[in-house]
Amino acid sequence: MKLSLDWMNDFTPLKEVGLDAILKKIAISVCEIDDATEFRPELDFVKIVRIESLEKHPSADKLQIAQVFDGSSKSQIVTGVTNVKIGDLVPLAIPGAKLGDKEILESELRGVKSSGMLCSEKELFLSEEGNGVWILNGLDQAEVGKTIRSFLYYNDIIFEVDNKSITHRPDLWSHFGFARELASQLRLPIVFNPFESLWNFDLSVKLPKVLENQNAHSYYASSISGVSVFPSKRKFQSRLQKCGVRVINNVVDVSNYVMLEMGQPTHFFDKKFLENQGGISLEVSFAKKGESFALLDETSPALEEEVLLIRNQGKPVAIAGVMGGKESAVQNTTTEIVMESAVFMRERIRKSIRSTGIRSDSSVRYEKGLEATTTLPVIRRALNLLKENGCSELKASEPVGFLHIPHKEVRIHTDIHFINAKLGVTLSQGDITDILERLHFIVSWKGEHLEVLVPKFRHNYDVTIPEDLVEEIGRTKGYDTIQVSPLLAEVKTPIRNLNRELERKCKTFFAIALKYHEVFNYSFQSYKENEFSGDPKLSVKIKNEMPEEQSVLRNSLLPSLLKNTRTNQDRFSEIKIFEFGRVYFNLPEPENEKKIFAFAVSLDKKSSEPDLKLLEEDFLKIKKEVESFLESIQIYEYTWKIQQETIFHPGANLCLVARSGKDGLETIVGNLGYVHPAILDSFELKKRVIYGSFEFERIVELWNQNRKVSRFVTPSQFPEAEIDLSILVGEKENTNVFTDLVKLERIPELKEGWVYSQFMGGNVPEGKKSVSYRFRLVNYERTFTQERIKEISDQLVILAGKNGFVLR
């Protein structure tokens, strides 16, 4: 965005401050400035001169020798133009002037000295066309000796503001708004406020009709007569050109001028065109799909239903806040107009921009969110500018329209301690009041608490919470004035999050020690998948429209892990995965949600594998891994029990039982087993899958009970010993039965025992299996003797015999 320093000086005496001070304050307290440059400084070397005499060139028929006067001295110019005469006022580029890539030098043309060049508007880059020298006779303030830059009101500095740095400040998207901000920051007075302009409306002018609805915050229209259309006065043209806006005529230029000055767009309709549509009845409404009409940019886009329009008698005449229609625009013959001043909802303007692809200066301002009560002051200011710009016989009707929420107020409550703590400084009540009142806030104190009434031009989306006030005070005081101080932090013992801590331990052990891979899945699955793992009636249905396969929240991690296994079954011979996730139930809190740690293992055994020995070995291997995991988190006291669950194969599932809580009651902590073949088939799995899960909160409870108990035992300095024992057990009998019996014997040297192999067939009786156990012996006092090892071995043999087990 471009801003004119000369224009802003109309509202506050910025030129008294100095450019460096202004730029510094803008950079520190307002926004980013990309550039600040003199506008067309090369025109300082082009002066208005009067032609004193004209003579033919002695050596060239097409050249003339002109003597010109610049108010202080005469110069001789050789020129080839034919449209000048004695007494004409014309622009002269003196030696040293640079016009584009051309530098003007003193020269001789056919032996005659020439001290400059008489210029056309095209040569001065003021017009695309130029027939001969620019004749300035009779033009207002065309005085001999004046520079063309001064004559055109080009003596100015243009600020180029980085738009993204003020996108949250719609009040700064205008010359007055920016000047008001600088006046506050630099402690300057406001000498002219365009929002306070007055106008006497004429009751004799017929009122337009405006239909009220909720499609705009505010919408007013005024009927205006006595309009004459011709080029704008030089001041208006100059200010628009300096801001990069194309000059059109004295009516349209005022609309653009008001937008750049006050920040609120307006639009002028040709009144006769509206009347020819059946009368003037303006309404803000939405487009019909595919509707189209010609716009000012010569396009006729097919509109979507989300585009907001201005209609007259139901016919579209403008895209609201974006661009007017071509047919209803002001023409050279226009004598009566209807002025629109409105504030639209920023969300609707954004949708119109997105749908049409049209981004105009008006829409850029509307999409920021303008203050709705400015519509009437803008009309009064525009009428004054129309009169100033040549429409001296102007008459206007009282504006007709509507304003929703005219008395909106935003009050913020905070206290001095909050402000000082946030800024890291110590400000007094007087300091805070001074800064906020300079920024047009109204402040009232009650002890150390303050109430702040936000000015209307800031209260829409900009300043709404106490932190916004802190920012206003900080930027105005200057962040560079806040002293740097080292950060101080109290050294405290960190609060331990046991759940998070144990979760990391579990993940680390499974991923590193056991070589599992962690997976992440969505919590959505189908109602049918919930039937596998519990009562589907307890399923939590998702309210959003979702496909059937993602219509409920999961009640088990099993379906997710089986789908992961299916995806990878043809890629890897061995799959070991785990997941931490939540499951959900349609139950009262806290039973409605549980955290589960689950894993799935596929070890290349087909779902139809007949060799039960191989299957049991795999199962025991995974069971051993689970036990090593439990040992790693200091859970030692537990038992495995057979418990039938529908998700598991009837002959291959266990539940993990442990005592927890103060009452020491046995609780099921987890389960382990081969997934039921029917479930494997429904997931199109070709291989056997072992699935295990833990209710995480139960594991946390057990770990928390045991983690403070030191179970460290000094390693024995004497060699360990092992005893192997093979017995016959029933084909379907649990192999844990014998190890549990051994534990009850409480043999001092017995450290642990486990199954290390199984065998069926051969010379093993039918219905039986041979199970080999290995027992580890540790003595902390002496080296094992053969006699002691034999005693323990005999004790185990006797134990087996007493309980009906046959030795192998």
Swiss-Prot record:
Domain named FDX-ACB is located at: 716-808
Keywords assigned by UniProt, alphabetized: Aminoacyl-tRNA synthetase, ATP-binding, Cytoplasm, Ligase, Magnesium, Metal-binding, Nucleotide-binding, Protein biosynthesis, RNA-binding, tRNA-binding
Please give the Gene Ontology molecular function terms for this protein. ATP binding; magnesium ion binding; phenylalanine-tRNA ligase activity; tRNA binding
Q: What broad class of enzyme is this?
A: ligase
Reported cofactor(s) = Mg(2+)
Q: What is the catalytic activity of this protein? A: tRNA(Phe) + L-phenylalanine + ATP = L-phenylalanyl-tRNA(Phe) + AMP + diphosphate + H(+)
Q: Where is it predominantly found?
A: cytoplasm
In the UniProt record, which is one GO cellular component term? phenylalanine-tRNA ligase complex
Subcellular location(s): the record lists:
Cytoplasm
Q: Which SUPFAM superfamilies match?
A: Anticodon-binding domain of PheRS, Class II aaRS and biotin synthetases, Nucleic acid-binding proteins, PheT/TilS domain, Putative DNA-binding domain
Q: How is the cofactor bound?
A: Binds 2 magnesium ions per tetramer.
The residues that hold Mg(2+) are 462, 468, 471-472
What is the superkingdom listed in this entry's lineage?
A: Bacteria
Q: Which residues form the B5 domain?
A: 407-484
What are its GO biological-process terms?
phenylalanyl-tRNA aminoacylation
> What EC number is given for this enzyme?
6.1.1.20
Family annotation (NCBIfam families): pheT_bact (TIGR00472)
How does it associate, per the subunit comment?
Tetramer of two alpha and two beta subunits.
Family according to the record: Belongs to the phenylalanyl-tRNA synthetase beta subunit family. Type 1 subfamily.
Protein name listed in UniProt: Phenylalanine--tRNA ligase beta subunit
- The organism is Leptospira interrogans serogroup Icterohaemorrhagiae serovar copenhageni (strain Fiocruz L1-130)
The gene that this protein is the product of is: pheT
